Swiss-Prot record:
Its EC number is 5.2.1.8. A lipid is attached at residue 21 (N-palmitoyl cysteine). Keywords: Cell membrane, Isomerase, Lipoprotein, Membrane, Palmitate, Rotamase, Signal. It comes from Streptococcus pneumoniae (strain P1031). SUPFAM superfamilies: FKBP-like, Triger factor/SurA peptide-binding domain-like. NCBIfam families: PRK01326.1 (NF002361). The lineage of its organism: Bacteria, Bacillati, Bacillota, Bacilli, Lactobacillales. It is found in: Cell membrane. This is Foldase protein PrsA. Residues 143-241 form the PpiC domain.
Amino acid sequence: MKKKLLAGAITLLSVATLAACSKGSEGADLISMKGDIITEHQFYEQVKNNPSAQQVLLNMTIQKVFEKQYGSELDDKEVDDTIAEEKKQYGENYQRVLSQAGMTLETRKAQIRTSKLVELAVKKVAEAELTDEAYKKAFDEYTPDVTAQIIRLNNEDKAKEVLEKAKAEGADFAQLAKDNSTDEKTKENGGEITFDSASTEVPEQVKKAAFALDVDGVSDVITATGTQAYSSQYYIVKLTKKTEKSSNIDDYKEKLKTVILTQKQNDSTFVQSIIGKELQAANIKVKDQAFQNIFTQYIGGGDSSSSSSTSNE
């Protein structure tokens, strides 16, 4: 999924809402037994220092702040479309995946909506910063479309063996891709794929190697990070077509805009700064000492601390 599911989110959201009845009252009884009870307040006092519970309270705050500021600009269809994509990806296992993450369909929708609201806020700020300097920097770093044939393998020794065949005179690279590549999306087409420097379908190491090749050139074995943790995949690339880069920046203006905005969305420091500004503007007051530090990753010290101060009012 594009956004990670929060494990235990349903339970923790329920826990976080107990804060409302934690002050001045034991709240309702949650558990009764022979000779004793467990109240909402007792439960709240036990869990409020749990890092997971604190993270959920932070998420709830962000959700409310961004919903108030940007909620009217987000169409529910965007959320529904994302849910539809996830259902297509996971098929009949979708409900099980949600359940394992401690979520229902409704809580997942709420999570997606919050993510999209943050994305909307980031996009607005990023668009306001689309300066000539930003465009020039993106243009200097941009490489237009190339077409290549790619063979992906999971074993380095196998990759070296295939490379030897690929560099042999008269080698049929397309057939080698069909016979050996583990990339199901491209192998049947002889490994052919078109991409530019902004594409995400191809690892950065592979793009860099491909851009350095002449047409009909074949790379050495390229090692890239695999999809599994601490794993590697091995690529062999043959460049078949190279687009000459225009010297006129206006020819790429729309593409460069997309590149810049995507970079901003992927810049965790930039995203955190936007969230921090919105939280400060909302004049957040923390009512329980246990939660006084949950906003520090977004709101630093100095003047900003007054916007997330602890209050006993």
